[in-house]
Amino acid sequence: MFKTKKGNLKSLDYKKQDYVIKLSNTDSNNLESVLDSKIGLNNQTRQNNISKFGSNQIVVKKFLIFKKILETLIEPFNLLLLFIGILELIIYFLFQRNWITLISAFIIFFMIFLASIVDFIQEYKAYKFNLKLTKIIENDVFIFNDQIKDFNNLNYQNIKNNLIKEKQSNLTIGDVVYLSKGDIIPSDCRIIWSEDLYLDESTLTGESKAIKKQTTNNKTNFLELENILFKETLIVSGNCLAVVININKDNYSNSLLDLIDDEIITDYEKGINKVTKILIYLISILVFIITFISLLKTGISNWTSSLVFGLSIAVSLTPEALPAIISSNLKLASKRLSKNKVVIKKLSVLQNIGSVNILATDKTGTLTLDTTNIETYLDINNQKNKLLKQYFFYNAYFQNNLFDTIDKAIIDQFKTNISDIKLIDHLSFDHNFRISSVLINFNNSNLLITKGSLEEILEITSFINVNNQVINLCDNYKNMIIDQVNSYAKKGYKVLVLSYKNSDVIDNKNLIYLGMVVFSDQIRENVKQVIDTFKAYDIDIKVLSGDNLYTCKNVCDQVGINSNTSLIGKQINNLTKEELIKISQSVNIFYKLSPLDKAKIIDSLKSNNVVGFLGDGVNDAVALKKADVGISVNNASSLAKQSADVILLEKDLNALEHAFIIGRKTFSNAIKYIKITVASNFGILLTLLLATILFKFEVMSPIQLLIQNLIFDFANLIFVFDNVDESSIKKPQKWNIKSIIPFAIFNGLTQVIISFTNFMILYFGFNIKGLDTYSIELFQTCYFIECILTHIMIILVLRTDKLSFFKSIASKQMLISMLFFSVVCFMIVFISSSFNSLGFKMMIGNFNNINLSWWFLILLGLEILAWIISEIIKKIYLNIFKNWI
């Protein structure tokens, strides 16, 4: 989680260090006096402590206003504009006192301000919005809802009935929290009871080695204190009870926030950066050529005018609004998703969501409901055995697992008296070994009870209880057990079996088989329709499960997932990386998987695919991190939530369906803006290059180029509100930088053709040849208007691969905005022409005995022609490249 700028956290001056060390070295019975609080709080004392100490409010990295402003100002495009603006000021003050040059410089600075302020506002809004989302998805923690009075007899069984769930932010000094494997420490704590406790403290120390923790301390180094749990570290095994000793900003990890550099550049952001560099290089080279040609034609004595003209072209072609538009696009999508109960932890992951073409998911709780029901329990004779029921209950009851739905179902439905039972030891369920054991004192003898999946239990079982007689487990009985279990598994039931023996230790060998319990999962409502929708959007579903093949196949058949191909977890290690990549593409069911198996499968699926993985358990954390889009749910383990990119507030595939669609729409609008902007700018740049060669005058003045760019900037902001064709989101889209150049070359030709058609009409039809100032200004005004309207027409045509206006229409917001900016274009010309400023002249009256008003009718024809040419080029481009946006 933490990537520091300085690197060495141990040197940090932490104001509460001595206090924490003192608590570490204080005996548990004396903690109350040091903490100035009861150890363990009920509702009343908790409220009193919150009033006294405060609560563990979420602390996030500060939004540093001046730093963010500086970051927006030094965006590459803004730096380019800043350089040009300063250069124009130098020209004005030292070489050419032309007020147009001064105004031009101020317009450039205004453009920088505009782009920066929009980007800054979007960043700030995103920050505030993320604060709200952070509170929504904060972790719950189990707390002991009473005072701890006897520190010598603490254990899970004594306290579990008093555990309640509480939001992490509601913790206060003195709260006692129960933590187990996969939990992320919610606040700095002092351990008061532990069992085989190991932590991963790499978030603080950078060392991934598991660190043993216990109730006593023998270390002096602050970060090595053996009974202190630091916020944001992770429990990798065991469990504990710990008292909260720091909250809010006093937590050690929160004091590090200013040292943290948590910015990870995604492929999407790398792509944007690459496009930015390409555009800057392209603009710089071509502007240099245009300036050089202009200089050759006007002479060295007029170098300042040529330079200002070249600089103005550079400004007009610089898409300085790109960061703001991308940011707005992502933020709008994030808001839409939050309304659909989907929380995006990092905005840039939206691009990956739109590109997902494989969704890997667990079966339990996703395709089926989280609740589990017991259908029956049977011994080898297909009889409901009372002893079997009791032993299953003992095994489940004495497990230190608050989240296991299997154990919960057993405890709820197999209630048995445990007053004479004493727990000696236990072995929690492990996804690699797939068994759980308890060692209890029962009827004055020690009894080992182990439950698990069929294959794993049979490997450690040598005997069988038949009619209360223990005999050898021969092949005949073994086959009977397998047939009995499979008869239920084939019907879609989950089956666990149980073996036992008298033992003083947990050694799990030579056990006695007793029987099985059968569980049923209910298919989620409407899940089949959602799966069908995923298929329609070209998303392949892969089931990654720890269950057996029969159970997985039954569920998949019910929800419409192809179950013809499957792969068992133990085969994965026998395959080479290349073999696994090849096989995983065609397999839909992966069963009996360990956490490492899941991660390997996700890794193999990522070859030529964008993979989403939906998981909620501790065992899913590695796979969630491996996936291109890790998806978890709000009630998942804290480790799963931390590892995920996307959090579903409800475990509902419908919400995920909305996420994929909105992700694709967001991606489509972003790429649409980039491609259309590059195409239009390329067309304008090529037009100006050719015009500089062919004409003796500038076809558009520097100030007009800047005004045009301002209009383009405002117009482009509307892209985020555009509709997206259903056909363009039917298939996952990938970020392909290489496609931008051919798209720009082909579709930029429309701008060139229309502009030069306009030039020829003005030059030969209206006899406007730039022989005097008035003639030049008429020519420039006509090009200014035509260029803006053609740009708007190109936007409306290129936004879709369909026949624009007939088979695909832009959103109302976009159409109204484009109409508005068209009107603004004419208003600027009319107003400035009336005041004889900015070099605009209205096409009214006569010029060389020709009625200039006819040009407006020609302009209409030019825009219709622009639409026709754009559609023809679109058709040609699609035939060649087969893909549009």
Model-derived segments and spans:
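Non-lumenal N-terminal regulatory segments of integral membrane proteins
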Residues: 1-172, 177-178, 183-185, 190-198, ...
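Non-transmembrane, extramembrane segments of multi-pass ion/lipid transporters
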Residues: 40-71, 135-143, 147-159, 209-212, ...
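Hydrophobic alpha-helical transmembrane segments of multipass membrane transporters and ion channels
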Residues: 75-86, 274-289, 316, 323, ...
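Helix-interface capping motifs at the ends of transmembrane segments in multi-pass membrane proteins
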Residues: 82-107, 281-318, 331-341, 684-703, ...
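Hydrophobic alpha-helical transmembrane segments
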Residues: 104-140, 145, 264-358, 517, ...
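Basic, amphipathic juxtamembrane/active-site segments
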Residues: 198, 216, 369-389, 558-560, ...
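Cytosolic catalytic regions of ATP/NTP-dependent phosphoryl-transfer enzymes
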Residues: 228-234, 352-513, 519, 532, ...
